Amino acid sequence: MPTIQQLIRSERQELKKKTKSPALKSCPQRRGVCTRVYTTTPKKPNSALRKVARVRLTSGFEVTAYIPGIGHNLQEHSVVMIRGGRVKDLPGVRYHIIRGTLDTAGVKDRKQGRSKYGAKRPKPGAASTASTGKKR
């Protein structure tokens, strides 16, 4: 606890909030080029092959970003857009690749939550019982 004299001499320091996505540099999204596309395994209770990419951003950072959805068309030198948002069971993965922008294709045959995966709205005639797998 400082004395009043110490507070007069120099005021209290403001606590600086540390950002969770420093590579974005206060921007909502950033463009980057994939330097490596690979799969990795999640932390202890979970088991899978998660698709991730190493991305060199326009801000100069090189980060690991998660590729959401089923299937993707990314390879080395693909231009991608990333947003913030970590993947809880992948240590060091703090960013998501945005599907349906630049070189990243949207998820095929996606019916629900399409906006999150860059999927276009299906044609009204194309939605038959055979494609959805549901009985009427």
Curated annotation (Swiss-Prot):
Record region (Disordered): 1-28, 101-136
Disulfide bonds: none
Entry-linked InterPro entries: NA-bd_OB-fold, Ribosomal_uS12, Ribosomal_uS12_bac
Subunit description: Part of the 30S ribosomal subunit. Contacts proteins S8 and S17. May interact with IF1 in the 30S initiation complex.
Superkingdom of the organism of origin: Bacteria
Native source species: Cyanothece sp. (strain PCC 7425 / ATCC 29141)
Family: Belongs to the universal ribosomal protein uS12 family.
Protein name, UniProt field: Small ribosomal subunit protein uS12
Any single GO BP term: translation
Residue spans of biased composition, Basic residues class: 113-123
Residues where 3-methylthioaspartic acid is found: 89
GO terms assigned for molecular function: rRNA binding; structural constituent of ribosome; tRNA binding
Keyword Ribosomal protein set for record: yes
Record's GO cellular component terms: small ribosomal subunit
Function recorded in the entry: With S4 and S5 plays an important role in translational accuracy. Interacts with and stabilizes bases of the 16S rRNA that are involved in tRNA selection in the A site and with the mRNA backbone. Located at the interface of the 30S and 50S subunits, it traverses the body of the 30S subunit contacting proteins on the other side and probably holding the rRNA structure together. The combined cluster of proteins S8, S12 and S17 appears to hold together the shoulder and platform of the 30S subunit.
UniProtKB keywords: Methylation, Ribonucleoprotein, Ribosomal protein, RNA-binding, rRNA-binding, tRNA-binding
Pfam families from the UniProt entry: Ribosom_S12_S23 (PF00164)
Keyword Ribosomal protein: yes
